[in-house]
Amino acid sequence: METINNVFDSVISLQSAIPDNSQIINQIFPNVYVLIAHVISLIFLLLLVIRLAWKPTKSYIEARTKEIQRKMEAAEKAQLESEKNLHISRIKLLESKNTAAEIIENAELDAEKTKKKIEAVALNKASQIESEGYSKIKKQELELEKRKNLEVSKLALETAGIFLSKKIDEEENKKIIDDIVNDLTAKLESSSKEK
């Protein structure tokens, strides 16, 4: 209980320490002249703050705003310029791709033409070589035919000479013909080996 009494005593002592309303007003505004002096000094202080602090701050803020606006306009201009340059570079890239495609296409066409020319020249040379080979073969065949005819005519003359020089009976006729055939076969084999 004693604690409750102590609390009440402290509350009562606080109330007595707080001055009443009239005392507060008298302490703040002891008289009207002091109040007027305070108001005038407050107005002077406000004017001084406006003159010395607000106006330079306001002009600094305006200058800073103008600077920011100028930089934003420059950034927008630079962005427009970069977009324009990007568009131009894309167009140039597309033109380069088209030019490269044309160059490749022309190169392929030129390669195809060159290939056809080379094939035509090769076919022409092959045809020429073939005709030369064919003519050489024909020439060799003609030579062989001439040799064969000469051999046959020589053989025929020899045979005729043998027949005319000898008395021919049937058995000797067969023997002479066999000798001539064997001789002719040997000569043909030797001439084919020479080739």
Curated annotation (Swiss-Prot):
It holds the Pfam family ATP-synt_B. It comes from the Bacteria. This is ATP synthase subunit b. It is found in: Cell membrane. F-type ATPases have 2 components, F(1) - the catalytic core - and F(0) - the membrane proton channel. F(1) has five subunits: alpha(3), beta(3), gamma(1), delta(1), epsilon(1). F(0) has three main subunits: a(1), b(2) and c(10-14). The alpha and beta chains form an alternating ring which encloses part of the gamma chain. F(1) is attached to F(0) by a central stalk formed by the gamma and epsilon chains, while a peripheral stalk is formed by the delta and b chains. It is a single-pass membrane protein. GO terms for cellular component: plasma membrane; proton-transporting ATP synthase complex. The keyword Transmembrane applies. InterPro entries: ATP_synth_b/b'su_bac/chlpt, ATP_synthase_B_chain. One of its GO terms (molecular function) is proton-transporting ATPase activity, rotational mechanism. Belongs to the ATPase B chain family. The keyword Transport applies. Keywords: ATP synthesis, Cell membrane, CF(0), Hydrogen ion transport, Ion transport, Membrane, Transmembrane, Transmembrane helix, Transport. Coiled coil: none annotated. F(1)F(0) ATP synthase produces ATP from ADP in the presence of a proton or sodium gradient. F-type ATPases consist of two structural domains, F(1) containing the extramembraneous catalytic core and F(0) containing the membrane proton channel, linked together by a central stalk and a peripheral stalk. During catalysis, ATP synthesis in the catalytic domain of F(1) is coupled via a rotary mechanism of the central stalk subunits to proton translocation. It comes from Malacoplasma penetrans (strain HF-2) (Mycoplasma penetrans). The gene is atpF. The chain crosses the membrane at residues 28-48.
